[in-house]
Amino acid sequence: MKIVHLVPSMESGGVEQVVMELGSGLSSRGVENIVVSGGGRLVPRLEKEGSRHILMPIGKKSISTLFRIGALRALLQAVRPDILHLHSRVPAWAGYLAWKKLPPEDRPGLVTSVHGFYSVNRYSAIMSRGERVIAVSNCIRDYILDHYPSTPPDHIRIIPNAISPDQYHPAYSPSREWLTGWFMSYPELKGKFTLCLPGRITRLKGHLDLIPVVRQLLEQGIPAHAVIVGEAKKGKEEYKNEVLRAIERSGVSQSFTWTGHRQDLREILSTCSVTLSLTKSPEAFGKSTLEALALGKPVAGYAHGGVKEQLDAFLPVSYTHLRAHETLRHL
C-alpha cells in the first residue's frame, strides 16, 4: 500500500499534525507514505517517523499553484500510489486536477479529509469530491451534507482524529528535567491556577474572551494565570498586538504568558490546571482538548462543534449553562 498526502506546508497546525501522525502510524504498519508540501519545521520529524517528504509549493492561493498541476501529474505517474489523500483546499484543487488528467485506469483512489468548517462556496466544494470523504466529527458530516448535498452520504466516513493511549493517559507525568526547565523558563507559573489556551494566534481561537475570565477569577481570589501556546503566522501579527493591548487595558498583563510555538504540548497540557477551547465559531474537532482529557486534565470550552461532542461525554449538563468564570471555579 502506498499513499500520497497533499498538504500546504509542514510548519505547524492541526492539519499538519494529523498528517504527521497518520504517516507515523501507517508507516509502522508497513504502508509507504509520501507527503507533498511546501516544507516546514515538522519535516525532519515527519521523515524520522517513516514518511518520505517531497518539497513542492502547492499551498499558495495564487496562479503559481496551478503551474504545479503538471508536476503533480508526473509525480503520480512515477510513484503510482494506491491512494491520493487531499487535506486542504488549495492542494486539493491542484491534486484533483492532476488526478483527473490521468487515464482512468491509472488513477489512485481519491480521498479527501474535511478538517474544518470551511466557507461555503465552489472553492471549498473540492473537499467534498473525494471518492471517499473523511469527516473528522459528526458535526462535520452534517456540514458536508447540509452545504454540499450532491455528496453521496455513503461516500462519507466519520473518522475522528485520534490520540495514542500510550502517549496520553492519566498516569503520564513530565520528566523532572522537563519540569525544571519549564519553571526556569516561566517562573511566574509556580503556584498558579494555569489556564492553557493552545493553538495558532488567530481571532478564531478567542483570546479576547480569555481576558475577562482571567480578570474575574483574580477578583474571586483565584491565582489565575493564562498560558497561551502558539504563534501568529508571519505577516498576521496585528491580531496578537490587538490582544496584547486589550490585556494591558484590563490590567492583567502580569497574568498572561506567551510561549510561542512549542513541540512539547503534551507536557504543557499535563502541567497546566485546565485546558480551554474558546473558539468563536464551531471547530471541527479540537485535538488539544481531547489530548488534555486523555491526560486526565480538566477541560472547559464553548458548547459547539467537535469540542461539544467531546465535552458532552464528560461535562455534566448543568455546567453548560454557567458563565465561563463560574465553570472554571467549579473545576
Language-model region placement:
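Carbohydrate-associated surface elements
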Residues: 139, 162
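Glycosyltransferase donor-sugar binding loop
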Residues: 36-41, 198, 225-241
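Conserved small/polar residues in nucleotide/adenosyl-binding loops
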Residues: 320-330
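Active-site donor-binding acidic/aromatic loop of nucleotide-activated sugar
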Residues: 235-240, 253-262, 268
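Short His-centered aromatic/hydrophobic patch
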Residues: 86-92, 114
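A conserved, positively charged/aromatic
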Residues: 76, 100-138, 150-151
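Short hydrophobic beta-strand element within catalytic cores of glycosyltransferases
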Residues: 298-301
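A conserved mid-protein helix/loop that constitutes part of the nucleotide-sugar donor-binding site
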Residues: 13-21, 193, 197-218, 238, ...
